[in-house]
A protein has these predicted regions:
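N-terminal intrinsically disordered, cationic/polar leader segments
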Residues: 2-149, 153-180
Length: 180
């Protein structure tokens, strides 16, 4: 049995979980999230969410722990939320935002303007002498990761000097330059 899937998810105070017709809905102070599920049975009892599978088929074993983790992330999201920070490393790399529009200058001939989803709150930090930082916060972990990966994908860190967009705290694999 899945070690992750068999452990129940505790529902904290202020969070409501509803299960109906293969869809689970989690509501909390930060918002509401829904997730479809198949091949597993989700039940809510005694302030806990239980995920069970009907057989030991390979697909069901794979989805058992997955759906338990997704439900856990939904509950954490509507109570505490998630944060990701990206750092722009490079000369002339700048960032600014006007509402939900992110304006990135990453060394291309043009600025990249990205419309951020309304569920994600955006903050840009630019201090003199330090690398600019983009701070993203959301209650939806999947959407947050998707937006952060899209921003990072505009200029991935290169292995020689480390220039590019990287997550704060990310350790880059560096290469030695050519020897003379």
């Amino acid at each position: 049995m899945s070690r992750i899937g068999k452990s129940p998810v505790t529902i904290p105070a202020g969070v409501t979980v509803e299960v109906a017709n293969g869809i689970i809905t989690v509501k909390g102070k930060n918002g509401q999230l829904t997730q479809e599920f198949s091949d597993v049975t989700v039940t809510v009892e005694d302030g806990q969410v239980l995920v069970e599978r009907s057989s030991d088929h390979k697909d069901q074993r794979a989805k058992h722990g997955l759906y338990r983790s997704l439900i856990n992330n939904m509950i954490i999201g509507v109570t505490d939320g998630f944060t990701k920070s990206l750092e722009l490393v490079g000369v002339g790399y700048r960032v600014s935002n006007q509402g939900q529009k992110l304006d990135l200058a990453l060394g291309y001939s043009h600025n990249i303007i990205l419309e951020i989803a309304p569920e994600v709150t955006l903050e840009t930090i630019s201090e003199k002498g330090k690398n600019p930082i983009v701070k993203l916060t959301s209650f939806d972990k999947q959407l947050l990761g998707q937006v952060a990966a899209k921003i990072r994908g505009f200029r991935k860190p290169e292995p020689y000097k480390g220039k590019g967009v990287k997550f704060v705290g990310e350790v880059l694999r560096r290469k030695a330059g050519k020897s003379a």
